UniProtKB/Swiss-Prot annotation:
Keywords: Developmental protein, Differentiation
PANTHER family: PANCREATIC PROGENITOR CELL DIFFERENTIATION AND PROLIFERATION FACTOR
Region named Disordered: 22-46
Record function comment: Probable regulator of exocrine pancreas development.
Gene that encodes the chain: ppdpfa
Keyword Transmembrane helix attached: no
Any one Pfam family match given in the protein's UniProt record, by short name: PPDFL
Induction pattern: Expression is directly regulated by pancreas-specific transcription factor ptf1a. Probably also regulated by retinoic acid (RA).
Name under which the protein is recorded: Pancreatic progenitor cell differentiation and proliferation factor A
Naturally occurring in which organism (per UniProt): Danio rerio
């Protein structure tokens, strides 16, 4: 966690992730020898990535090997996109719309407004 005080400086609230960033600016309020930019240690339960950045998997996920389809290209050809965070996929949305239209035509009602995305 981090806190941002009214001075605008970012301060780590947990010692494990504390990092003091040095400044080469001559008009800095802190001497650069005091704030040298300590390295954040590698968490003990997390495997290291080949890139050297253990945190990269949190932002970028697993990288595909060169020359292999990445899933997005194959999904783009079929027109389907899978969303992993629980949102409705394009295919499911189409099925719901078709079902809604068929149910409303069976009951003699006009189809309602489209489902919100």
């Amino acid at each position: 966690m981090a806190a941002i005080p009214s001075s605008g400086s970012l301060i780590a609230t947990h010692d494990y992730y504390r990092r003091r960033i040095g400044s080469t600016s001559s008009n800095s309020s802190c001497s650069s020898s005091e704030y040298t930019g300590e390295v954040i240690p590698h968490p003990p339960g997390l495997a290291r990535q080949d890139s050297g950045h253990w945190w990269s998997s949190f932002f970028f996920g697993k990288q595909n090997q060169m020359g292999t389809p990445n899933g997005f290209e194959s999904q783009q050809k079929t027109g389907t996109y899978t969303v992993t965070n629980g949102q409705v996929t394009c295919v499911a949305r189409e099925i719901v719309m078709k079902r809604h239209l068929s149910e409303s035509s069976d009951s003699g009602k006009e189809p309602g407004s489209p489902l919100p995305s």
